[in-house]
Amino acid sequence: MKIKTIIAVFGVLFSAHALADVTNAEKLVYKYTNIAHSANPMYEAPSITDGKIFFNRKFKTPSGKEAACASCHTNNPANVGKNIVTGKEIPPLAPRVNTKRFTDIDKVEDEFTKHCNDILGADCSPSEKANFIAYLLTETKPTK
């Protein structure tokens, strides 16, 4: 099956840095890809490009304000972010930079539910989640 080949290649590309957080992130990409493919057989593999677009896209929040993931996490998810409401510092999202990201798979799902509902007004789709995490896996260097 083409999807398994694509996922296998994706896994090999990232296996050189197989830390627990990266491994969990890869597992989540695989999980969400399978769910997305089950719902839509045309969805074959995560798109890093779509993940980056999603990360930077501004949405009108349920409160009427515009926000994007990058609003708090900066344009580069390898950077330290800052909550736009509280001003609190946010550790980098990129699992290759922040080894604590994606260590708790249940927490990841809770955070997706919370943030997707806060920003989009609905849960993110499995394909959006797969694309998003695939993009985060590519960000390895904070900008200065």
From Swiss-Prot:
Binds 1 heme c group covalently per subunit. The heme is low-spin in the oxidized state but switches to a high-spin form upon reduction, due to the dissociation of one of the axial histidines, His-115. InterPro entries: Cyt_c-like_dom, Cyt_c-like_dom_sf, DUF1924_SHP. Gene3D superfamilies: Cytochrome c-like domain. One of its GO terms (molecular function) is electron transfer activity. The keyword Transcription regulation does not apply. Keywords: Disulfide bond, Electron transport, Heme, Iron, Metal-binding, Signal, Transport. Residues 1-20 form the signal peptide. It holds the Pfam family DUF1924. Heme c binds at residues 69, 72-73, 115. Disulfide bonds join 116-124. Monomer. This is Cytochrome c''. The lineage of its organism: Bacteria, Pseudomonadati, Pseudomonadota, Betaproteobacteria, Nitrosomonadales. The gene is cycA.
